[in-house]
Every structure is written in structure tokens, then in C-alpha cells.
């Protein structure tokens, strides 16, 4: 036979490779469409001739062979439906089998088991009681050595099925179908249907454990379909694709009765005598009342479970194991316990347990006989102080709480009155947020709120905004003990702080009028202090049970007129123009926090609770948030709070030794204060201007030691800070370069800093006079616009008296009697900077 020049199926005598592949795919689609419609083409003889020549065509590449194989799969379905005469059918099937061997091993291909319907029906009866089996499309058996298998089948519209039926994939291990392990998918095998992976049956979405039949209706096509299994099975499996229906459970299931084991008389004293057993009438699956008590036919226990709960659970995940003894109990092994069913019908609804004796008698135990009373869990609102004040006693289990920390669970506290917090005041227009305390629970781990903080570093005529990351190390010791604005706070006020108004500021005008009548006396809170301090000392092992009384302050928070303690008072800066960084310590590690750039007058309140700390006194004039360094057990913790305080320079020391050191009286440009992070430090510049030093230390139970700091630092200074023995030094632009430790910086005087040089050669430095002179970077004169050319530097030091007097005369910054003016600086001045090169000589738009 010779193929005609033009065929009605689209084939011609001569084809190139691409045209041949496209024609094969088109012919396969036409055959599949005819099979789906259950129709037979008219010119079968011509089609048989074309297919015979296609199979005999020499295919050199794998792509062409795959296309021809796809066409032959459709032709095989047509042969099975009787499209061709007997002789042509045998010839085509022989050619197809020959080509099939090139894509699959012939020894691994098994048509089907002897009775697939019987085996699948048994599996459905045992493990899929809600599934009804329909027409089986294809079934075959995979052997343990099988690695790659293919099976084709066809679907037509005239197949016996209902529109509601679905097509499911069944994978069953044939060695033992009595347990649910037989429906576990082989973990090393992936199934593909028409080239697409089947959900939960491929290696990328494999599901362990027993599986339900997989719905593959969306992956099928009318006509020929191809199922592929790739991987090692490791056992004998039955794979089948069949129509199935999902049916509901019967209202009255036909179940067999449970046969109780016979009680054998005991003649030996060594036999165990069974006593009464307590049986729960609640299902162990849902903890609800049992409706139909069932258990497995091999179960030996008396406890039953509900039939409906058990079946519904296994229809979602068919594990089919007893919830009490974990034995395999498939659907056909479920038995009804008629004895317990009779008990459920006779007892009332309030019965929770029954006691069944060995002779069959039983007795009801109701819920009222329970000795254990459930304690509801209490959720506390950390923002509501009444959450803990109204907390009642909590019942605990002594057996559970043996190894837990012994702490009191009953808190008897009272809300602080508003009058106690504010004190008498004549100003009725002051914002309420100025009197709000930081309110935190003593059980909170994050004791203080954390705000994003930035540092505005002055660099030439620009400000560089440097974000800082806050790292809080919480420990049992660092509990919520924030300070209020009162210099003599009570422990009740210390324990309660309010984070809601964090960031509230007070204008400078109101801050300057803030009267000392708002100061809360410790004596007013002593009635509420003893029980709280006893609780605190019980938890943290303190001996002191009450803070010593503190003197009252009645005028502008000005405590300068009080009699000083044995400590010698030193001047403290009164005005800080830019954010300043102070020391923060968490658990023997110091943490440096930058204050927000919008804060014009930061202030530090170093507080020490029972430890030794080196604190720096604080400036006196504050119009915006301040920094509260708090020390718990020898560790310093500085937190920023938003209280508007004008003249508060108090160093509080409770039960420890405080080392107070004044800060420089005038710092006009950049300055970096040392900080330590667990033995490691990093320097970051800050802009500050301190013109009015003032110190008012108050000491409670300690011996402060105050030492002066340099009186004037007029230019940027780099202060290296030790990181566990490693110094990381960062130069500020246009400033002098120096290297100090924390204690060396505190002991600096103008006399010993004028000609300071490092004691040893610094690592990485290049000495002059060597062959590397050309690599030394020399400072250059800063370039300024012609319109703003600064005058030549007057001298290496200048007298800032005029500048200081200008700020003293400013009405927003009150001056006390002990304010001092900044002296002249003995440090060298950078080239190009003099009186006009200071920060205050810059235009306002560059601040």
C-alpha cells in the first residue's frame, strides 16, 4: 500500500521532522475525540495504512519517538474498541508492544491482578466506609522490583457512570490488607497522570500515613490517558483508577455486638483478682457524651468510644486505631458494647463516670463528687493597673509547684491617688500627660518602653542622622522600677509607670514654671510601702525593707539650698543644646542609648539600687524628655522618659556607693561619652553644648565621690571605649584625635591635656620621616562659600564669656547661684575654627 499524496487525516507522502511531529499530534487528538464521542471514522483502511507507515518510519531522535508513542497509545485504545479488522488490529498491537518496550521494562508491566474488583472492594469495606466503588478504568500490579511503569486507558462518554461520580486513584499494598498500613503510599514512588503530578502522591507533596483515594477527575481527558509510576515500590501494590461515589453513613449501622471474655474461676492464690473499674461516659475523642458505645473486637478494656466520632475522624484520616489501646480497629472490626449502652440509657445526663464491678454490677459517680476544681486562667492587661491590684488568690497544685520559684500570688496594692502623684497645684491648665507615670507590671519582662532613637551628629555644616538600635537584655533583676518626676518617689510610684504617654513633652515656658509643690514625699506613701518592699525583698533577697525618708523640696525642685551630704558637690552642666548619650548598664554590661534628636534638654537621673556605679551628674535645665539611668544590683540602666522637668539635678543612691562626676562645662561641637556593651564598646559622636554647670546630688545611704571633669572642651573629641580590651576609635570631622579610657577621661584637667600624646605607638600609625610620608593624610582647610568665608582663627583658645553671657541672659534658661562660666580651653583648636567656627556661630538653618 502506498500513502496517497494527500490524506484526509492530514498526512502527505513526504514530511520533514517538525511537520511529521505536528501531524502525529493532530492525528492523536482526532482519534481521542472520536473515542470520547464513541464514534468510528469512515475511512478506516486509509487510517490503518497511515499508521502502519508511521510505525515503520525511522526515528533517530527521542522527541520524535515520544510523539509517535503518544499516537500509538491513542491507536491502541481504538484497536481495543474494534475500529480495525482483525488482521490490521493484530499488526498494530504487535508494533505498539515493540515500541512500548523502549519506554518501559517488559518484565515490570503486569496487565492486572486476577480479581482487582474483589481486592479493592475489601479495602473499601474496611477503610473507606463512605466510598462506593464504580466502574474500574484501569488496574495493574506493581512488584517490589518495579521502578518505572506505564499504563494507558481510555474514557468515553458512554461508559457506565453517573454525573456525580468522581474518578479516584487507589494504591493498596496487597501483602496484608487487615491493617491500615496497607493504604500508606509508597514513599519512594511518584505518580503522574497525563504528564501531571498527582497531589499527595509525588515526592514534592508526599503525605505520610494512610491516605484516602485521590480524586483525579480534573487530570483526565476524553479518549486516551496515560498513568505513570516512577520509583521503587519495595512491595507488591495494586494500583487502580475507578469511578467512585461518596455516600453518607447509615443512621442505623449494622454492627456486631461485642463479646465480653468469660470470667474463669480462679483456684490459685497467685491469680490476679479484678476489682471494680471506673469507666467514663465521655468519648475519649471529643470529650462529649457517648451516643453509641463501641470498641474493637480484640480490645480487652472496658472503656468505650463513640461510633460517630470514631468514624468521622477516620473518614478524614484513615488511621483506624483504637483511641484507648491503639490497636488496629477497622470499620468491620467495630463492635457495640451492649452493657455500656444499657447503662447510658438508664443513667441521667449529669452522670460522668460509672464504677463497674467484676460481677457486672455498676454504680454511678456524678460530677458533684469531683474533688478537683478547675481554676480559670486570668489574663492581665499590662496597661491597666487594676489588673494586678484586683488580682485574687490563685490555687496551685503543690505537686506541680515543688520546683518552681516561690513567689506570692496575692498582691494587695492600691491605686496611687492623683493628688499624691501631682501634689497641690494652682495650675489647672497644665496637660494631664505631665503627671502621667510610667505604668508597668512588675511581672513584665520588657520593663520600659523602647522608642526609636536617632542622633543628629554635626558634621561641618550638615547634620547626619544616625539611627541607633536598642538592645534590651531582660533579666529577673531588671523588673519595672521606673522613676516619676518627683525627686523622692515612693516605691509604689516606682513600680507603676505609664508607657502610654511616652514621648510627651512640655514647653520650656511651662517647664520653667513647674513648682516644687508637685513633689511627692516618701512619707506620704509609707503606709503603702512596707508590704511592697517586703515582697520585693522576698523575691530579690534584699535586707532593706523600706527606703529611708528623704527631705522634701518646695521650690522649683531646687535642692541646692539643702545641707549637703558628706560628699563634696561639683558643678553640673545646666543646659545641653543637643542630644547626649549617657551610660546604660544591663547585668554588668553597659548599653549606650541615644536620645531623640528632637530633645533639646536631656537630663540624666542616675539611680543606684544596692550597688556600686560610676555615674555622671546631670544638667539642670530640661525642657523635654530626660534619661533615667537605673542601676539594679550594681548594673546601670538608662531609659528615656518624657517628663518635662526644668531644674532637677538629683543623683539618687539607695544602699550603695555612688561616684558622681560632673560633665564638661562647655562642649560646643561633637562629643562621645564612653559606653560598654558586655566588654565591647563602640563610639558614636553626639552634638552637645553645655554652658551652665550645676550639681545637686542627693545621697541616701551611700558615700558619693565626686570628681571634676575638664572644664571646657571646645572642639570635637574622640573618646575610645573599651570593647573587652579592644578599642574602636572613630574620628569626628575637624576635631582633635585622642584616646582615653573611661577613668582617664574623668580625671582630665586642662593642665594634663594640653600636650597629651599616646604612651605607645598606635597600631597602624605611620611615623613621620619614613618612606611612607606620602601616604599620610594631612588635614585640609574646610572649603566654605565665598559669601560665608569665616575670618582667620583668632587664637588656639578663646574666651567664651560673651557667648555664655548671651545664653545666661536668655529668659528660657534660668540661672541659679552656683552656675559657673566655662573657662578657656587648653586643647588645641583645629585650623579654620575659632570663635566663629563654634556651633552657635552657624546660621539657624544649618542647626
Curated annotation (Swiss-Prot):
Sequence repeat coordinates: 569-591, 592-614, 615-637, 638-659, 660-682, 683-705, 706-728
Coiled-coil segments: none
Keywords of this entry: Ligase, Metal-binding, Nucleus, Repeat, Transferase, Ubl conjugation pathway, Zinc, Zinc-finger
Region ranges (7 X 23 AA approximate tandem repeats): 569-728
Pathway membership: Protein modification; protein sumoylation
Assembly description: Homodimer. Interacts with MOM1 and PIAL2 to form a high molecular mass complex which mediates transcriptional gene silencing at heterochromatin regions.
Protein name, per record: E4 SUMO-protein ligase PIAL1
Amino acid at each position: 500500500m502506498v500513502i496517497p499524496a494527500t490524506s484526509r487525516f492530514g498526512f502527505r507522502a513526504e514530511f520533514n521532522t517538525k511537520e511529521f511531529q505536528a501531524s502525529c499530534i493532530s492525528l492523536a487528538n482526532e482519534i481521542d475525540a472520536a473515542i470520547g464521542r464513541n464514534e468510528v471514522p469512515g475511512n478506516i483502511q486509509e487510517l490503518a495504512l497511515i499508521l502502519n507507515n508511521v510505525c515503520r518510519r525511522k526515528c533517530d531522535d527521542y522527541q520524535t519517538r515520544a510523539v509517535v508513542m503518544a499516537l500509538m497509545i491513542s491507536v491502541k485504545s481504538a484497536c481495543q474498541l474494534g475500529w480495525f479488522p482483525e488482521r490490521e488490529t493484530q499488526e498494530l498491537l504487535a508494533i505498539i508492544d515493540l515500541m512500548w518496550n523502549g519506554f518501559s521494562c517488559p518484565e515490570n508491566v503486569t496487565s492486572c491482578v486476577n480479581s482487582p474488583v474483589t481486592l479493592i472492594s475489601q479495602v473499601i469495606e474496611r477503610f473507606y466506609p463512605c466510598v462506593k466503588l464504580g466502574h474500574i478504568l484501569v488496574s495493574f500490579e506493581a512488584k517490589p522490583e518495579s521502578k518505572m511503569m506505564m499504563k494507558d486507558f481510555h474514557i468515553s462518554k458512554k461508559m457506565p457512570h453517573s454525573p456525580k461520580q468522581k474518578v479516584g486513584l487507589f494504591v493498596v499494598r496487597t501483602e496484608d490488607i487487615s491493617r491500615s498500613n496497607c493504604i500508606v503510599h509508597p514513599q519512594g514512588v511518584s505518580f503522574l497522570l497525563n504528564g501531571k503530578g498527582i497531589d499527595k502522591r509525588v515526592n514534592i507533596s508526599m503525605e505520610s500515613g494512610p491516605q484516602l483515594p485521590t480524586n483525579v477527575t480534573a487530570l483526565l481527558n476524553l479518549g486516551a490517558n496515560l498513568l505513570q509510576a516512577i520509583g521503587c515500590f519495595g512491595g507488591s501494590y495494586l494500583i487502580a483508577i475507578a469511578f467512585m461515589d461518596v455516600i453518607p453513613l447509615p443512621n442505623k449501622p449494622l454492627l456486631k455486638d461485642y463479646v465480653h471474655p468469660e470470667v474463669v474461676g480462679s483456684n490459685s492464690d497467685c491469680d490476679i483478682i479484678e476489682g471494680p473499674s471506673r469507666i467514663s461516659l465521655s468519648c475519649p475523642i471529643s470529650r462529649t457524651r457517648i451516643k453509641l458505645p463501641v470498641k474493637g473486637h480484640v480490645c480487652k478494656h472496658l472503656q468505650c468510644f463513640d461510633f460517630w466520632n470514631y468514624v468521622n475522624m477516620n473518614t478524614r484520616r484513615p488511621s483506624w486505631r483504637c483511641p484507648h489501646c491503639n490497636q488496629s480497629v477497622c470499620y468491620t472490626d467495630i463492635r457495640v458494647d451492649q452493657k455500656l449502652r444499657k447503662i447510658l440509657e438508664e443513667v441521667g445526663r449529669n452522670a460522668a463516670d460509672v464504677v463497674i464491678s467484676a460481677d457486672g454490677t455498676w454504680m454511678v459517680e456524678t460530677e458533684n463528687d469531683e474533688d478537683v476544681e478547675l481554676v480559670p486562667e486570668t489574663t492581665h492587661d499590662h496597661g491597666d493597673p487594676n489588673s494586678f491590684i484586683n488580682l485574687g488568690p490563685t490555687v496551685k497544685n503543690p505537686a506541680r509547684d515543688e520546683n518552681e520559684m516561690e513567689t506570692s500570688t496575692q498582691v494587695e496594692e492600691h491605686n496611687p491617688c492623683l493628688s499624691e502623684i501631682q501634689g497641690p497645684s494652682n495650675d489647672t491648665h497644665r496637660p494631664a500627660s505631665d503627671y502621667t507615670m510610667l505604668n508597668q507590671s512588675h511581672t513584665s519582662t520588657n520593663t520600659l518602653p523602647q522608642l526609636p532613637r536617632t542622633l543628629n551628629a554635626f558634621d561641618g555644616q550638615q547634620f547626619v542622622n544616625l539611627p541607633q538600635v536598642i538592645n534590651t537584655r531582660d533579666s529577673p533583676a531588671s523588673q519595672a522600677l521606673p522613676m516619676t518626676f518627683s525627686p523622692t518617689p515612693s516605691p509604689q510610684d516606682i513600680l507603676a509607670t505609664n508607657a502610654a504617654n511616652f514621648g510627651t513633652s512640655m514647653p520650656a515656658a511651662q517647664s520653667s514654671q513647674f513648682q516644687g509643690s508637685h513633689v511627692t514625699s516618701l512619707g506620704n506613701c509609707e503606709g503603702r510601702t512596707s508590704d511592697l518592699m517586703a515582697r520585693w525583698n522576698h523575691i530579690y533577697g534584699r535586707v532593706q525593707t523600706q527606703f529611708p525618708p528623704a527631705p522634701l523640696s518646695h521650690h522649683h525642685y531646687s535642692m541646692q539650698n539643702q545641707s549637703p551630704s558628706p560628699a563634696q558637690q561639683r558643678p553640673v552642666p545646666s543646659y545641653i543644646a543637643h542630644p547626649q548619650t549617657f551610660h546604660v548598664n544591663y547585668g554588668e554590661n553597659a548599653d549606650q542609648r541615644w536620645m531623640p534628636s528632637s530633645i533639646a534638654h536631656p537630663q540624666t537621673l542616675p539611680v543606684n539600687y544596692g550597688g556600686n556605679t560610676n555615674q555622671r551628674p546631670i544638667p539642670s535645665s530640661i525642657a523635654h524628655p530626660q534619661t533615667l539611668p537605673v542601676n539594679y544590683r550594681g548594673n546601670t540602666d538608662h531609659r528615656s522618659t518624657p517628663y518635662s522637668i526644668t531644674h532637677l539635678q538629683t543623683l539618687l543612691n539607695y544602699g550603695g556607693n555612688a561616684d558622681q562626676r560632673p560633665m564638661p562645662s562647655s562642649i560646643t561641637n561633637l562629643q562621645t561619652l564612653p559606653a560598654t556593651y558586655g566588654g565591647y564598646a563602640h563610639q558614636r559622636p553626639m552634638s552637645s553644648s553645655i554652658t551652665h554647670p550645676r550639681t545637686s546630688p542627693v545621697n541616701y545611704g551611700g558615700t558619693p565621690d565626686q570628681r571634676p571633669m575638664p572644664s571646657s572642651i571646645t572642639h570635637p573629641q574622640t573618646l575610645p571605649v573599651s570593647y573587652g580590651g579592644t578599642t574602636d576609635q572613630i574620628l569626628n570631622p575637624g576635631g582633635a584625635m585622642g584616646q582615653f579610657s573611661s577613668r582617664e577621661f574623668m580625671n582630665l584637667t586642662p593642665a594634663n591635656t594640653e600636650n597629651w600624646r599616646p604612651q605607645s605607638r598606635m597600631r597602624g600609625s605611620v611615623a613621620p620621616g619614613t618612606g611612607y610620608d606620602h601616604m599620610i593624610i594631612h588635614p585640609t582647610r574646610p572649603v566654605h562659600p565665598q559669601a560665608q568665608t569665616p575670618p582667620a582663627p583668632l587664637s588656639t583658645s578663646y574666651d567664651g564669656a560673651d557667648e555664655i553671657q548671651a545664653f545666661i541672659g536668655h529668659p528660657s534658661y534660668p540661672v541659679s547661684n552656683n552656675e559657673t562660666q566655662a573657662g578657656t580651653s587648653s586643647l588645641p583648636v583645629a585650623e579654620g575654627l575659632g570663635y566663629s567656627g563654634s556651633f552657635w556661630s552657624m546660621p539657624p538653618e544649618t542647626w
